[in-house]
């Protein structure tokens, strides 16, 4: 389990995260949302042990990430948004680097590369950005780590590749693994992320499962605007609206509309989910 209590981090005098607290349960695929600059990437690098906290505590299964103990590092993988382009064939890179992760599977790497229609025998420095990104996603999933942190993994992927990404994550992630995926393209991941975390620079605005969200909020697709809506947006054929769910009615969570509603009503929605 990941436990974060009153976490703080600054770059010199620039406060990036302050007083952040939350828990992440095992065996979930979390979506991490937030406006640009609120510290999503910083949080991922702190979890991966690449930076040390300035305040508060951060523990993963009782270990402090920045201690970077071999037993801890063997159980995590961090995939940044920007990836390098080694002058090597993808299969050779995977075989050589996979030895650092106890549960790495070269067979799984090859299978996921095939899902992405990627050539494992192509040199990585000859790949397009999208092909390179898919190679590192394949490697990350093939490491079979207990914790996998991904920063904007669908950046640079075309529409078919985004569908392949969802398929790969769904098929090749074990029930015991915990994924935390940062994204500003919520629609790309709507079918696979649950729970949803919405981060603010000084607060966790939301950390809830889709069932919890649907229990508290109602997502309405209607031709008529409701003046009590927390958020409204015109779409072809009418409006998507986010309302308080006062009747227990069922609805499908629209993550983009949820995100916008939370930003407009930070305190109200946080209080709603903390009851």
Residue ranges and their predicted role:
Residues 56-67, 71-72:
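Conserved ABC transporter NBD signature motif
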Residues 33-35:
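The feature captures the beta-strand-to-loop junction immediately N-terminal to the Walker
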Residues 48:
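Helix-to-loop junction immediately C-terminal to a conserved catalytic motif
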Residues 2, 17-19:
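Conserved structural motif at the start of ABC-family nucleotide-binding domains
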Residues 164-180, 184-243:
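ABC transporter nucleotide-binding domain
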Residues 71, 78-135:
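ABC-family P-loop ATPase nucleotide-binding domains
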Residues 148-152:
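Catalytic Walker B motif of ABC-type/P-loop ATPase nucleotide-binding domains
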């Amino acid at each position: 389990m990941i436990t974060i209590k009153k976490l703080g981090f600054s770059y010199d005098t620039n406060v990036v995260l302050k007083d952040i607290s939350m828990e992440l349960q095992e065996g979930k695929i979390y979506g991490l949302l937030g406006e640009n600059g609120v510290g999503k990437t910083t949080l991922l690098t702190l979890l991966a042990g690449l930076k040390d906290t300035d305040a508060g505590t951060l523990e993963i299964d009782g270990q402090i990430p920045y201690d970077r103990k071999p037993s801890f590092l063997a159980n995590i993988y961090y995939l940044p948004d920007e990836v390098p382009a080694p002058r090597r064939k993808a299969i050779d890179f995977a075989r050589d680097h996979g030895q650092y992760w106890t549960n790495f599977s070269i067979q799984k790497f090859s299978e996921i590369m095939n899902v992405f229609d990627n050539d494992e025998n192509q040199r990585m420095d000859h790949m397009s950005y999208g092909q390179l990104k898919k190679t590192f996603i394949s490697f990350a999933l093939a490491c079979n780590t207990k914790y996998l942190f991904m920063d904007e993994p669908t950046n640079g992927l075309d529409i078919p590749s985004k569908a392949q990404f969802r398929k790969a994550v769904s098929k090749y992630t074990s029930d015991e693994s915990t994924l935390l995926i940062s994204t500003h393209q919520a629609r790309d991941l709507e079918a696979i992320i649950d729970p949803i975390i919405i981060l603010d620079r000084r607060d966790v605005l939301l950390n809830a499962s889709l069932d919890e969200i649907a229990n508290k909020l109602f997502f309405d697709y209607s031709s008529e605007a409701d003046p009590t809506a927390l958020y409204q947006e015109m779409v072809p054929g009418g409006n998507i609206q986010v309302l308080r769910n006062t009747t227990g009615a069922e609805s499908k969570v629209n993550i983009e509309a949820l995100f916008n509603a939370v930003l407009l009503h930070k305190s109200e929605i946080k209080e709603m989910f903390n009851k």
